[in-house]
């Protein structure tokens, strides 16, 4: 039995859950998410909690059991609170701006890099150097933030580039030179 999978998922008051076979739909104040779970996983709603259990004792069911519980818990938290990732742009002349639903990054390339925001994701910029990605789908928020970071990952000598807020870049020493 999975230690994570055994835990019941509490349902906040403003969130409603619909279970139709293997499809779980979660509605809340921020929006609606749905996901189809694998056939070897059973989902039940009891009182104000959701319980995820394996339908069979196969190896595959045990592998996916904790994952499915976490995915449903992330959906519940997403529609009630939402998710946010912050990125910091560091470097001389490096900056970001939002034009409509598109993020425009000037990070040292000959042309600005334009990144359209996926459906359900909001991108905001503070002070031209702080990018905020938020939405209700944890997976989509994380993937969007990772794509923005991948445009110009932090380099190890000066630390220039796009990094997550709170991420520590271990800087290397440059060449020693002749004495």
Swiss-Prot record:
Record keywords: Ribonucleoprotein, Ribosomal protein, RNA-binding, rRNA-binding
GO CC term (a single one): cytosolic large ribosomal subunit
Pfam families: Ribosomal_L6
MF (Gene Ontology): rRNA binding; structural constituent of ribosome
Single GO BP term: cytoplasmic translation
The keyword rRNA-binding is assigned to this record: yes
Record's subunit section: Part of the 50S ribosomal subunit.
Described purpose of this protein according to its UniProt entry: This protein binds to the 23S rRNA, and is important in its secondary structure. It is located near the subunit interface in the base of the L7/L12 stalk, and near the tRNA binding site of the peptidyltransferase center.
Entry's family note: Belongs to the universal ribosomal protein uL6 family.
PANTHER family: 60S/50S RIBOSOMAL PROTEIN L6/L9, LARGE RIBOSOMAL SUBUNIT PROTEIN UL6M
HAMAP family: Ribosomal_uL6_B
Protein name, as recorded: Large ribosomal subunit protein uL6
Species per Swiss-Prot/TrEMBL record: Trichodesmium erythraeum (strain IMS101)
Gene name for this UniProt entry: rplF
